[in-house]
């Protein structure tokens, strides 16, 4: 009995099914081979002499498709069959459909004991069918990262030196490191909170920074935020280093806060800015830079607040107020007084603040005003065998180290939880003198904006000028700086007005270069006299001389351009007049030739001369009228061009 004939369509269908099964099992060959059972059973039809005879083939030749290597298509992440978004807390049913656990609970048929698939309506026989995809993914073998990538991740986050103190006591601001931190992709366009730890050396700052740094990643990921055990985060540790001269910052920001209101939190170590070995000028400048690089300060002291701590705090608050007034920023947003190993273990933080205020007795007025307000709070951290006391309430006595660790971690969690509320911000209602009004969230400074403000501050500090040894002298220099900038802007505005007023040709011709030079000189002297009286620094004469030199240079640049423009306008008018005179001479010569021709033809030389004279007079009058009309049209076109808004400034900024 002959075998049934296998058509080409059936052959391709059966071949595709077999090959799909083999491909699923991992066969990556580019050539397809017909199975042996089909190769032997395949019957071909041969026509011989008008009759068909069946002829079987013992073997089927290998079919080469020559597909070559094809790139595997990109696999999209699994999506929920209900919300069509990426799976969140996914579950998988026996039917093969995946859902978010929240979507599945919402669309589950009420009253159905067994789970029913919302897509295919298939009822699962066992509740074991709800298997979490996340748990199954955890069972997959984890591939280690390449060594190069591991090294990159290890060095990506580190503490960077922002402000260095050289051997002579001078400050070196490293703008490259500042830009690397504040212009990080997570902080460039995001409000920033700079959590700065102040204090003397060997006062436990590294211990505090380590716990803050270990708690930030867990809080960022949504965990409880408690510091993890030591060693659980390799590479994320502040560490103790004897070379702490200067200001340091952790290079990687941590995004904290609610969704849509994230704040990039940085950790800052002020190093030895409180060292008495530094000069007064260096300490004042470090206080100014610390104010710019912090929005949440923690003054870490040992045992109790000493007179040196209060003196430094007084200077810091004074400098912060001066900087805040000049740059339009909030001077002190939040300050914690953390007293470690306190001997006043039976008092609360508020009681300790009262003792401090009584001790001050008007010696440090700015510190007293700060402690009386709501911007500062005090925490007493006793030794591990003593109890913990905060500002609001006192805890029961405890003599175990576990109690100390518990309360210390509670303080760390409280600091990290409230840090997003103290992002770097400008003063409410204004930024600073001469700047636009800020409202709402625009008061919060992003990383890029703060980096620009620090660059402006470094430009002022880097100028060779008189030194200052106190916040008052610094305030006087900043006041004089504002006055100098105001004088420059006033003179620039006057020059711009003169530029606009002399745009037209005939308006410029009415003001000679010497006259314009006298006008600029008079205005310069008036500005110097008016703003020079308001200067406060002792080096008033040097400041006025430098300002006069800058104004004189700007006036000279304008006069050079104005003189060239005046000469160009004068040459244009002279060219028009010269063209008119040439036309007049040509008219006279032409009239004379016409008169001579008429005289020769008519034989009346006298009449020809008279005609020539008359023609000359007529032509001359026509040329004069034409010249006047031309000049009038030029002036009219100039008026229309100026009134139409075509006012190109003479001075352009690159």
Swiss-Prot record:
Pathway this chain belongs to: Protein modification; protein ubiquitination
Binding site for GTP: 340-341
GO molecular function ontology, one term from the record: GTP binding
Keywords per UniProt: Cell projection, Cytoplasm, Cytoplasmic vesicle, Endosome, GTP-binding, Membrane, Metal-binding, Neurogenesis, Nucleotide-binding, Nucleus, Synapse, Transferase, Transmembrane, Transmembrane helix, Ubl conjugation, Ubl conjugation pathway, Zinc, Zinc-finger
InterPro entries: G_GB1_RHD3_dom, Guanylate-bd_N, P-loop_NTPase, Znf_C3HC4_RING-type, Znf_RING, Znf_RING/FYVE/PHD
CDD domains cross-referenced by the UniProt entry: GBP, RING-HC_RNF112
Post-translational modification comment from the UniProt entry: Auto-ubiquitinated.
Membrane topology per record: Multi-pass membrane protein; Peripheral membrane protein
Lineage: superkingdom: Eukaryota
A GO cellular component annotation in the UniProt record: membrane
Zinc fingers (RING-type), renumbered ranges: 80-121
Tissues/organs with expression: Expressed in most of the brain areas, including cortex, striatum, hippocampus, thalamus, and cerebellum (at protein level). Expressed in lateral amygdaloid nucleus, and ventromedial hypothalamus. Also expressed strongly in the marginal zone of brain vesicles, optic stalk, and cartilage primordium.
Sequence intervals crossing the membrane: 570-590, 603-623
Annotated compartments: Membrane; Cytoplasm; Nucleus; Nucleus, Nuclear body
Keyword Isomerase: no
Gene3D superfamilies: P-loop containing nucleotide triphosphate hydrolases (3.40.50.300), Zinc/RING finger domain, C3HC4 (zinc finger) (3.30.40.10)
Induction: Up-regulated by traumatic brain injury and hydrogen peroxide (at protein level).
Domain GB1/RHD3-type G: residue ranges: 189-420
Class of the enzyme per the UniProt entry, highest EC level: transferase
Annotated consequence of substituting residue 97 to N: Loss of endosomal localization
Keyword Membrane on entry: yes
PANTHER family: GUANYLATE BINDING PROTEIN (PTHR10751)
Similarity-based family: Belongs to the TRAFAC class dynamin-like GTPase superfamily. GB1/RHD3 GTPase family. GB1 subfamily.
Quaternary structure annotation from Swiss-Prot or TrEMBL: Self-associates. Interacts with SP1 in an oxidative stress-regulated manner. Interacts with SIGMAR1 in an oxidative stress-regulated manner. Interacts with ZBTB16 (via C2H2-type zinc finger domains 1 and 2).
Role noted for this protein: E3 ubiquitin-protein ligase that plays an important role in neuronal differentiation, including neurogenesis and gliogenesis, during brain development. During embryonic development initiates neuronal differentiation by inducing cell cycle arrest at the G0/G1 phase through up-regulation of cell-cycle regulatory proteins. Plays a role not only in the fetal period during the development of the nervous system, but also in the adult brain, where it is involved in the maintenance of neural functions and protection of the nervous tissue cells from oxidative stress-induced damage.
Name of the protein in question: RING finger protein 112
Origin species: Mus musculus
Gene symbol of the encoding locus: Rnf112
